[in-house]
């Protein structure tokens, strides 16, 4: 299944990792900014864990993403 949940999680995780990298943050720094453990950021970025929309918004805020199209 090319568009199953696991594939979508990995794609979202890769996009979030790229945004974090563009913000010049390590996963540990990003985790501290949002009050999580680094392992949670890592699990989200690898697609090993699902992510709630509210958590995505927290990360986007931490990464300074203001583009409304990226935030959808």
Annotate each language-model stretch with its function.
Residues 14, 24-25, 51-54:
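Residue-level signal for the short linker/turn that defines the boundary of a DNA-recognition helix
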Residues 17-18, 28, 57:
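Residues within the helices of the helix-turn-helix
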Residues 20, 31, 60:
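The alpha-helix within a helix-turn-helix
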Residues 23-42:
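Short alpha-helical DNA-recognition segment
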Residues 50, 62-72:
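Interdomain hinge/linker segments and adjacent boundary elements that couple functional modules
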Residues 55-63:
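Hydrophobic micro-packing sites on short alpha-helices
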């Amino acid at each position: 299944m090319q568009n199953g949940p696991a594939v979508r999680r990995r794609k979202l995780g890769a996009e979030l990792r790229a945004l974090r990298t563009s913000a010049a943050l390590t996963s540990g720094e990003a985790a501290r900014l949002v009050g999580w453990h680094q392992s949670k950021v890592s699990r989200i970025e690898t697609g090993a864990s699902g992510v709630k929309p509210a958590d995505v918004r927290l990360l986007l805020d931490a990464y300074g993403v203001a583009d409304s199209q990226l935030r959808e």
